[in-house]
Amino acid sequence: MPTACYVGTDGEKFYQYTMIEEASRERFIYAYKEASSYSTVDFVQRAIIYFGYAPEMIQTDNGGEFTHTQKTNRSHPLDILCSRLHIVHKTIRPKTPWHNGKVERSHRNDQERFYNYLKFYSYEDLQIQMKRYLRRSNRIPMSVLSWKTPIQKRQELEAARFC
């Protein structure tokens, strides 16, 4: 998560969750007051609404908000949701953040384009500004997409799917 997700006069810390659609590189981001399994489940449900479909696979690191960090017979809430929605939940190997390179790069971009330049006065203010930023960031052309924006690429992929 970006390093400067602090807001308010008390320096409250918030946590940015990020989902990237692999083919179009379109992103969905949302901030939470805690990094927990409940926030994770809520985020995945919000992302499904945002994208309009459930992904085939979700890849995460091994944080406790995504998976159990100790052996247990209990299922993690994210795994329960994924099972119910027929989503494969893949975790990267521990201590290998480069295996989540697209998300890590997007967090660096968020830091440079968003957190370094804006101040947030409350959690609500952060959410409002984050929504605006997400709209803008999904409209930035990317070299990997032949200088199309993620939104343009998604529209292109959807048009090809219905032909």
What is each model feature region?
Residues 12, 29-53, 57:
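Active-site beta-loop-alpha junctions of metal-dependent nucleic acid enzymes
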Residues 61-62, 72-82, 89-112, 126, ...:
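RNase H-like two-metal-ion nuclease catalytic core shared by retroviral integrases
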Residues 53-70, 93-95, 147-150:
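Acidic/histidine-rich, metal-coordinating catalytic segments
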Residues 1-28:
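An active-site-proximal beta-strand-loop segment
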Residues 31-32, 68-73:
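Short, solvent-exposed loop/turn segments at secondary-structure boundaries
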Residues 85-87, 109-163:
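C-terminal domain-tail junction helix/linker
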Residues 7, 66-68, 99:
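Short, small-residue-enriched loops and turns at beta-alpha junctions
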Residues 2, 19, 25, 44, ...:
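Mobile genetic element proteins and their domesticated derivatives, centered on retroelements
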